[in-house]
From Swiss-Prot:
Gene that this sequence comes from: gltX
GO biological-process terms attached to the record: glutamyl-tRNA aminoacylation
NCBIfam families: gltX_bact
Location (main, coarse): cytoplasm
Protein EC: 6.1.1.17
UniProt organism field: Psychrobacter sp. (strain PRwf-1)
Subunit note: Monomer.
Role description: Catalyzes the attachment of glutamate to tRNA(Glu) in a two-step reaction: glutamate is first activated by ATP to form Glu-AMP and then transferred to the acceptor end of tRNA(Glu).
Stated name of the protein: Glutamate--tRNA ligase
Positions of short motif 'KMSKS' region: 257-261
Length: 505
């Protein structure tokens, strides 16, 4: 047990950003935070890091809460159940962050930077031209306080940046790696408070962890290079720093970072596909971790009972769908027929979804048994399709892949998943590509329903939901052969240059 845990009750946290679908990586890190806290008789809390107001949505926040609870993870304190350290949304704590940013300014540990975006762009361009890594050059770091106050009083926009040493190394202690040395010259003078008065992750993270009495920060290894900034902020404030533990990142089978292009990454996708929450949690618990007896199938309680964070391996754990499906099958076969029946009914019994499916198939059926043929694809994981399924009178396979890929990006960016927004997006895409909507839609029927003889596809996309729709579209692109990196980059630019289809109406 560390010195910190000997002095204070263990408290861990997960702090997701509500900017998209709930990621399996969030559940993975949440699981290890909860297991560590419970194993030490402590508490696990959840807070929402929604300082990026342009991307954060209430819908995404609710999806995160629902997904984590579905998978079997719960928290002692959070935005929905409150607690002694409320509020638990960063957007509701902006005055707190301003107070601490001002404290750093007054102590001389931070400074106002009045650079315009154009100045920063020019600075980076010059550095790149000289073969340097782009970084803030500290041009306002030593501006006299009186002059800084005067410029601020005159209304000149500014951000607050932290001061960082330019020489030597920062020594960071990590539970899995021991001492890690990072040269200060690699650490940027981080923006702490933006021009709109909202904090960046780095200030909010440190302030919240201190005020919420977090003793151990267990997070992904992508944050290891930010640890010097956080350690420096704790020093500046004179606070005790939590113990750090940087977990290995989940990987695709090719060892690249887990990405939705190669694997479905949303918790809700696995829920809708029919993975048991116990099985998904079990699988995530095996990611880079082994039980003392090398047991493969175990419950959350069993994991907590014998939990030892030092058993985490630093090799990037591979998130393999085939292994997840095998493990889920083991959990399913361990059920009694009665239990399995109830699991199936629970999985399929979404009243709103069933009503929407009934409305879609009603004009097409003559017998109740016809519902199986017309409605089966709504419940499938992925439709059974081949490249030949997409044969088209006028569109080539390359064109179809490009259409489906751009549609995926555009649909993924929708602020709200509605049939109207789906229609506007696909109608706008057909106009932008100068393809008749009727001709363009045939590949969508195949990708979503596995057949052109189906219920209206835009309605189907709405009913099966964003997660499943996007997964099926990505799957269709891969079935057609996939798009190379160079072509994909070019296609991204094409998509970015297209107008906002929702605003074009």
């Amino acid at each position: 047990m560390t010195q910190t845990t000997a002095q204070r009750p263990v408290r861990t946290r997960i702090a997701p950003s509500p900017t998209g679908f709930p990621h399996v990586g969030t559940a993975y890190i949440a699981l290890f935070n909860l297991a560590f806290a419970k194993a030490h008789g402590g508490e696990f809390i959840l807070r929402i890091e929604d300082t990026d107001q342009s991307r954060s949505t209430e819908q995404s926040e609710q999806m995160i809460l629902d997904a984590l609870r579905w998978v079997g993870l719960d928290w002692a304190e959070g935005p929905d159940n409150g607690g002694p350290h409320a509020p638990y949304r960063q957007s509701e704590r902006s005055e707190i962050y301003k107070q601490y940013a001002q404290e750093l300014l007054d102590k001389g540990h931070a400074f106002r930077c009045f650079c315009t975006p154009e100045e920063l762009d020019a600075m980076r361009a010059e550095q790149i031209a000289r073969g340097e890594n782009p970084h803030y050059d500290g041009r306002y770091a030593n501006l006299p306080r009186e002059e800084s106050d005067k410029m601020a009083a005159e209304g000149k926009p500014f951000v607050i940046r932290m001061k960082v040493p330019t020489e030597g190394v920062c020594k960071v202690q990590d539970m899995l790696r021991g001492e890690v040395e990072i040269p200060w010259e690699q650490v940027d003078m981080q923006v702490l408070l933006k021009t709109d008065g909202l904090p960046t992750y780095h200030l909010a993270n440190v302030v919240d962890d201190h005020l919420m009495e977090i003793t151990h920060v267990i997070r992904g290894e992508e944050w290891l290079n930010s640890a010097p900034k956080h350690q420096l902020l704790y020093d500046y404030f004179g606070w005790e720093m939590p113990v750090l533990c940087h977990m290995p990142l989940l990987r695709n089978p090719d060892k690249s970072k887990l990405s939705k292009r190669k694997n479905p990454t949303s918790i809700t996708y696995y829920r809708d596909a029919g993975v048991l929450p116990e099985a998904l949690l079990n699988y995530l618990g095996r990611m880079g971790y082994s039980m003392p007896d090398d047991k493969e199938i175990f419950t959350l309680d069993e994991m907590i009972e014998s939990f030892d964070i030092t058993r985490v391996s630093l090799g990037g754990p591979i998130f393999d769908l085939e292994k997840l499906h095998w493990l889920n099958g083991e959990w399913l076969r361990a059920l009694t027929p009665e239990q399995l029946k109830n699991k199936i009914l629970d999985w399929a019994n979404d009243s709103d979804k069933l009503t929407a499916i009934a409305a879609a198939i009603q004009p097409r059926i003559h017998l109740l048994s016809d519902a199986v043929n017309w409605g089966g694809f709504y419940f499938q994981n992925l439709p059974s399709i081949t490249a030949e399924s997409f044969e088209h009178k006028t569109l080539t396979p390359e064109q179809i892949m490009e259409i489906l890929q751009i549609a995926t990006w555009k649909l993924e960016a929708l602020p709200e998943w509605s049939e109207d927004n789906i229609f506007k997006t696909l109608k706008g895409l057909s106009a932008a590509l100068d393809i008749k909507l009727r001709d363009m839609m045939a590949p969508f029927f195949i990708a979503i329903a596995g057949s052109t003889s189906s219920t209206p596809v835009m309605n189907s996309m709405y009913v099966i939901g964003a997660d499943m729709t996007l997964t099926r579209l990505r799957h269709a692109v891969e079935v057609l052969g996939g798009i190379g990196k160079k072509k994909l980059k070019k296609l991204e630019k094409t998509a970015a240059d297209m107008p906002d289809f929702l605003a074009a109406e």
